[in-house]
């Protein structure tokens, strides 16, 4: 019923832990390598025969969609190399998948971060389980699960808990990762056509006239196109925050929070909190 899909590159220090944690679940393991030069592929071969190469193209969604396409089961759970399974109720999970075929399963992720007071944990729910024929990934970086028909979808909380150490890096590595993310995010924002100056001007305008039906429809269309923009702005702010460039972080957070956002969304809550810290 379920395949676990993983994209990886030079993760010899993390991949064995990841794959070993799923070894006894009975799930198919699919590993896609995007250009490792270390022992990553050799380690993967100890746990699965389903290893594929994908030329890196600065697009995480493209790589993950390729991995999903290689799964032989109708449902997939997408996992990162620096994540590992902590808890799972397989019987309950399969029951929930069967009861929610057109929905996306959210799993509990525990982010482990080193702080001044030692190891700290941050918990969140993330969309990771879905039918491969109905959903795919969009977004060059910090990719999101999107319905193939582009409609909104419902989610359910799956009985799966994973650990994540991707944020628990030495200062130099953490900054390098943040700078890589910034480059990809700025490219994606550029491709979307968003412009900071134009956005600020639009916010300052006070349109007094009554919109025509055509203008209202146009605004609805534009709003749908811009749904991903605040999330990109949040991710840019977060990446600059991780790189310890707090002025830039505040700049992007301010633009992100200028949109009419649902305050209960996890990324909105985190954006407000991190903006305050910055």
What are these regions (language model features)?
Residues 1-3, 28:
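Cell-envelope/extracellular polymer assembly enzymes that use nucleotide-activated donors
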Residues 6-25:
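Short, well-formed alpha-helical segments that are part of the catalytic scaffolds
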Residues 27, 41-66, 70:
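Conserved donor nucleotide-binding strand/loop of the catalytic core
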Residues 62-68, 79, 85-251, 255:
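Catalytic-site signature of metal-activated, phosphate-bearing donor transferases
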Residues 76:
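Short aromatic/hydrophobic "clamp" motif used to bind/position activated sugar donors
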Residues 13-16, 38-47, 88:
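Acidic helix N-cap motif at the loop->helix transition within catalytic regions
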Residues 21, 33-42, 56, 80-84:
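A conserved acidic beta->alpha catalytic loop
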